[in-house]
Amino acid sequence: MTDIQNQINQLRNTLRHHEYQYHVLDNPEIPDSEYDRLFHRLKALEQQHPELISADSPTQRVGAKPLAGFAQITHELPMLSLDNVFSDEEFYAFVKRIQERLITLPDNLEFCCEPKLDGLAVSILYENGRLVQAATRGDGTTGEDITLNIRTIRNIPLQLLTDNPPVRLEVRGEVFMPQEGFDRLNEAALARGEKTFANPRNAAAGSLRQLDPKITSQRPLVWNAYSIGIAEGADLPPTHYERLQWLKSIGIPVNGEIRLCRGAENVLKFYRTIQEKRPELGYDIDGTVLKVNEIALQERLGFISKAPRWAIAYKFPAQEEMTVLNDVEFQVGRTGAITPVAKLQPVFVAGVTVSNATLHNGDEIARLDIAIGDTVIVRRAGDVIPQIIGVVHDRRPPNAEPIIFPTLCPVCHSAIVRIEGEAVARCTGGLFCDAQRKESLKHFVSRRAMDIDGVGAKLIEQLVDRELIRTPADLFKLDLITLMRLERMGEKSAQKALDSLEKAKKTTLARFIFALGIREVGEATALNLANFFKNLTALQTADLEQLQAVSDVGEVVANRIYVFWREQHNIDVVNDLIAQGVHWDDVEEKQVNENPFKEKTVVLTGTLSQMGRNEAKALLQQMGAKVAGSVSAKTHIVIAGDSAGSKLSKAQDLGVAVMSEAEFLEIVNSFS
C-alpha cells in the first residue's frame, strides 16, 4: 500500500470516528473547524488521486447527478405497520392478550419502550459493512430507492464502525427533521420568497423525495434506527434492547430516550414521562412504541394481519383536529407586522380549546388556498401557538369568502407595505399607529426590558387610548392624580406604579438598548452591544463596519441598528428619557472573580422559580460561563429547575454535575 493510500485510509478512519462521536454519541472530541480541515485534506488527496476514491468515503455523501425518477425496491422482509392504542384500558387489553398467549404475568414481562418518531420509515442495507441501498417503507412490500439521498444525511454511517461486519445487515429506522432545523429551513424559504413547509414531517418527506441529492444534503435531516431486518453473518443479542445497543456500538444512531420497563405499570409511567418531555425534545413524536423485549418471545407471539402481536403504538391525544374558519382578523405588532389571525369554531386540540390560530402572513394564506367558511386542520404542539396546517378543499361551501389582505392598517389606516425579500407586510404608521405604540410601550415596561412593576398591558392600553402617553418618556411624566382617574387605579395602585417608574430610572445600558425595541435586537444582542461599545454615544455613532464587529451582529441586524439611530424621532425619545432621569453606569472592563462557573460550559433546563431563563443566562455570562443549549460530554454543569426533562436525564447518564436552582442562587449571591 502506498504512502498516499495510507494517508487517505487514515483520514477516512479518523473522520468516521469523529462522525460517530458527534452524531451517535453526541460527544464531539474536536471542534467543527478541525473536522472541516481533515475533511478538506481528504478531499484534496482524492481529487489528486481519483483512482483511490471509494463509495464509502466521507467525501462521497453528495455528488451524484439528479435522478429522472425513483426506482422501486421490493423489501425482502415486509416493513409492517403497528396496531395503535389510545388509552390505558386498550394497553392493558394488549398486555392481557400477550399474557394469554405466553402464560406470563404482566408484572414479569419486560418491554423495550421507545418514542414514536413522527417521520418516515426507511430501510438501509449494509453489505460487508458498506451502505449499498436505502428504501422508503412504501406500502410495506415495495418502496422507493432513495439511496443517493440517504447517503447525504450526516448521522448515517456510509461504513459500519466494526472490523467484523455482517455479510448483510438491514437496519430500519425513522428519518425526521428536528424542530430547530425545520424553523431555519422555513425562515430561509420565507427570506427567498418561497413556500414554507407546514410541519417537520412534511419537510422531511419533501427533502427525502428530492430528485437532486444536493438539495437533500442541504436539509437538516436525522435518522434513528429502531429495528433490524435482514441479518446475515451476524451473531445478534437475544433481546431487542441489546440489539439497539449493538447497533449503536457499530456506528448506527439510536434514539436516546429508549428505556427498558418491566411490567405494565412501569410502561405506562414511561408513556407519561415521555409525554411530559415532549415539548422540549426538539423533534416531533406522536406517541410511544412498546415492544416485548425478548426476541424468543417475539417469535412465539408472531404476527397478525400486517402487524406484530408483540408490539403496539400507544398514541398521544391528537394534536391536529378539524374545525371551521369563521373569520380572519388582522393584528398589528410592535414593529408594524401585520399578522392574519384565524377566528375558528372552537375545537378541543391536545387538551386545550382552540378558537384562534395564526395564519402567519399573506404567502401562507395563498399557499393554503384558504377561504372563510372552509373546513381547516388545526395543529397545536406543546406551547406553540396553534396554526392552520391544511384545508379540506372538498368541503368548501358555496358561500365561502376569499380572504383579502388589507392595503391599509386596520388601526391607523396608514399604508401597508411589503419590502422585497421579506414575507411580512408592515404598517408604515410607526408610532403614529396606536397598535404599534401600545406594543412598543408594553415591551419597554416588560420585565426583561425596563422591568417596571405595576405598569402592565391593561394600564398601557388605557394610557394610550386616553392620549395620556405617546412615547416611553411620557411614562415618567405621569402623576398621581392622572393615574387615579383611570379604571381600577386607586391611590395605592397609582403610587405603586409611580414608585416603580422612579426605581426603573436606574437601569443598565443593556436593558435600555433592549427596551428601545430595535428590530432584531434581543436581550443577548443588547448585552453584546453594551459590552462592546461601553456607552450609548459610541453605539449611536457607530458605523456599519463597527456594528458588524460585535458578536452575533450580522449585516441585517447592523443595518437595523444603524437606521434606528439615523431617525431623529428616535434620538428625541432617547434624549427625553435621559432628561426624565433615566440613567445607567457605563460598562467597565471587569475582571471576573474566581467562581464555580468561570470558563465552564453550563446548560439550563426546567423552569426556574426565582427568575427567567434569560436572566439566569445573563448572570452566568457575567460570571464568565459559556451557556449552551444542549448537554454533551463537554458540559460541565447542568442547572435544573422544576420539570427538568431530557437534558437532566442525559446529564445524569453522562455523569455531568447537576445543580439545583437554590444552589445556583446561593453561588450567585455569594459572588455578586
From Swiss-Prot:
GO biological process: DNA repair; DNA replication
Residues annotated as the enzyme's active site: K116 (n6-amp-lysine intermediate)
Keywords tagged on the record: DNA damage, DNA repair, DNA replication, Ligase, Magnesium, Manganese, Metal-binding, NAD, Zinc
GO MF term (any one): DNA binding
Known EC number: 6.5.1.2
HAMAP family given in the database record: DNA_ligase_A
Function according to Swiss-Prot or TrEMBL: DNA ligase that catalyzes the formation of phosphodiester linkages between 5'-phosphoryl and 3'-hydroxyl groups in double-stranded DNA using NAD as a coenzyme and as the energy source for the reaction. It is essential for DNA replication and repair of damaged DNA.
Record-given protein name: DNA ligase
Origin species: Actinobacillus succinogenes (strain ATCC 55618 / DSM 22257 / CCUG 43843 / 130Z)
